[in-house]
Amino acid sequence: MFAPLLKKLFGSKNEREVKRMLKTVQIVNAFEEQMVALSDEQLRAKTEEFKARIAKGETLDQLLPEAFAVAREAGKRVMGMRHFDVQLIGGMTLHEGQIAEMRTGEGKTLVGTLAVYLNALSGKGVHVVTVNDYLARRDANWMRPLYEFLGLTVGIVTPFQPPEEKRAAYAADITYGTNNEYGFDYLRDNMAFSMDDKFQRELNFAVIDEVDSILIDEARTPLIISGQAEDSSKLYTEINRLIPKLEQHIEEVEGEVTKPGHFTVDEKTRQVELNEAGHQFIEEMLTEVGLLAEGESLYSAHNLGLLTHVYAGLRAHKLFNRNVEYIVADGQVLLVDEHTGRTMPGRRLSEGLHQAIEAKENLNIQAESQTLASTTFQNYFRLYNKLSGMTGTADTEAFEFHQIYNLAVMVIPPNKPLARKDFNDLVYLTAEEKYAAIVTDIKACIAENRPVLVGTATIETSEHMSNLLKQEGIDHKVLNAKFHEKEAEIIAQAGRPGALTIATNMAGRGTDILLGGNWEVEVANLEDPTPEQIAQIKADWQKRHQQVIEAGGLHVIASERHESRRIDNQLRGRAGRQGDTGSSRFYLSLEDSLMRIFASDRVKNFMKALGMQSGEAIEHRMVTNAIEKAQRKVEGRNFDIRKQLLEFDDVANEQRKVIYHMRNTLLAAENIGETIADFREEVLNNLISQHIPPQSLPEQWNVAGLEAALNTDFAVKLPVQQWLDEDDNLHEDSLREKIMAQLLVAYNEKEDQASAEALRSFEKQILLRVLDDLWKDHLSTMDHLRHGIHLRGYAQKNPKQEYKRESFTLFQELLDSIKRDTIRVLSHVQVRREDPEEEEARLRQEAEELASRMQFEHAPAPGIDQPLLDEEGGEAPVAVASEPVRNDQKLGRNELCWCGSGKKFKHCHGQIN
């Protein structure tokens, strides 16, 4: 009740932060005169001066005003652009590890240079993260002259880059790349066979462009490096022939089942579910074609894989539509990013779904894959010591940024006030009426020489709009995943008078639409343009620019609402950049996906009450509120899915960190002889305890079993029973010592046959191999556990607690297996004398061959095809995210282990250090 009054008296938190930063802005401005007086060499020398001051103990915060002044002056000299005061505030926001929300056209790329320059002075590296390779190259090459003028190096990481080139890019002061490439390189580094093969340094500071797209939209898609598994293409083809015979069961409408069938489709949760009739029908068909034995059930343990194939086929046919979720090009299924409309070449859906789509489209079916390494963007980006980001739309997701990443959102004031007019939504009864109204609006704008941008949610809609406009004889350009090669050219001219552009999800395109067109692109298209030609192009552009402004600026038309208000705001933001005039209007119908699934009943009843006729539209605040409520509902559900993904992946992430730490320690070690000796002792102790239980009577001892186990695990035949018969004083402990002594003799003989150096190298490579193979199998087991764990909710058990408990047990078994299998291999193998460098080179070559067979996948997020369950079946509590700026404290050996086992650290995960 007092909140509005307090806000009025003291201002909002955002306003108070802006006021605080304005004081620092004044200090930066005070340095400007001093910087202007410096020569280029003196200004460049400031970088080395700052580095020296940091070495003496000065902090980046203390350097900030002067460093920002240097970056601003360098921007003026090199690029002809001076940072505005509000851009300085944006730079401070990024440096403090926050998210800067800045409107389209406010110069986010230039803002980033301030925080990037300051943090690069530490020498620990800065990663600039973009949503695609084009923007990474464009921004790096655009800002490279500025950074190099200041004495800093710039690198770009791209897919399929030569290793040395990529290593050099990561070693640079500033590195540009995509979120996917950084994430996959992190996974690749943790599959390397040598420290020299790794790419990334310590993850120090990241500035994420379009941060909402990367940390929110893509958080549901785990990153997976996979290798090929067994070929089951024939099975997919057979299943694909059966799926069309299944009929969809239409749920009750006004008390009646309109169409009984075999399965239901839930569009809200994007799930398909076979009913009882469906299970019986599919079992009969599978039996007929010989895929299921007579009398067998699909739910038998050995048939669950077949059931997975059936569900993959159902999802491929009913949830994945051509030209919406994917396109077919060059005989391949290319996934379409639902948020940007771009294709994602090389990315494949996991769990057999991609193969099912290939079978549906009668394409060549590629082999299934097995996970070799995986992570999520949520957990990858939380590895950075400091994280920040910038976008035009973050405030609607401020709660999630804080909950998951502990990142605050700072709304940066615009340099010029917004002049765009946002009209109320127009809602029609049918899609046909809606499209007719859009065409009418387009004609009116073109008659006034206004440029128009039509935003669509799918490729299908963009092509439908294009066909309607062709019928009307209206000239236009189409920008979607099919024609993305022409993207830059289309965007450059989208602001010309009377230009009409249809775009699938403009979000993340990274290019501003300039009123009057882009004169710089026109100049770039000329070969050796003369000063006179450039002057003429500028003059022509100025006339067009003024003409468009007088006509009312860019008009944005949206053909439907997106699930996220943020994507809608991004589309609106294409008009009215930097104080330009402009307008936006959303056209909707009750047949739109969002309206049909979430908002149609309430709006339809309202429209009926008004007695609306065909062709009429409703424009009312109540309708807009109902739509926004529907969007908030979808956003809330998507947040729950992302939160659940994080909660489950946090369990795997702790295990991942332990394994990767173990691996890195192993790679860095010159000699792991002591580690192998510890493994041998532990494996032997466990083996003896299994056959000779502690404090047991000799009558309870299984000596024959122990002899057989020693032969299996250690490749030695020891007469244990004979020793016991010959020596009555031999007890459990002394027997243990005698066996260990014999094992050491056998192992030392192996060392004599080769050499100490060769055996040490071999131990390291064997442990790496065993660790990688078992970790790969563990990931597969964890996947199976996670995908079935939600069923525990029906047994009144908490799925998350069950997952944590069982995954901990699996991890304990993994650690034991690593030790046991390593010792078993080392005991059985015959080591010949081989140059360690040759052995390492051979292993590296094998690793490169493996890498060439790897696939990089986006898995369907857990939760999309499974219900969100906790112990009550309700909403789960939000996982509290760890701090993005952190200083890890080392756990004491006698403290309780972090994993929750209740054991001391030295007796649990401390054993592997």
Curated annotation (Swiss-Prot):
GO aspect biological process, one term: protein targeting
GO cellular component, one term: plasma membrane
EC number: 7.4.2.8
Catalyzed reactions: ATP + H2O + cellular proteinSide 1 = ADP + phosphate + cellular proteinSide 2
Main localization, broad class: membrane
Binding site for Zn(2+): 897, 899, 908-909
Binding site for ATP: 87, 105-109, 512
Assembly and binders: Monomer and homodimer. Part of the essential Sec protein translocation apparatus which comprises SecA, SecYEG and auxiliary proteins SecDF-YajC and YidC.
Record protein name field: Protein translocase subunit SecA
Source species of the chain: Pseudomonas savastanoi pv. phaseolicola (strain 1448A / Race 6) (Pseudomonas syringae pv. phaseolicola (strain 1448A / Race 6))
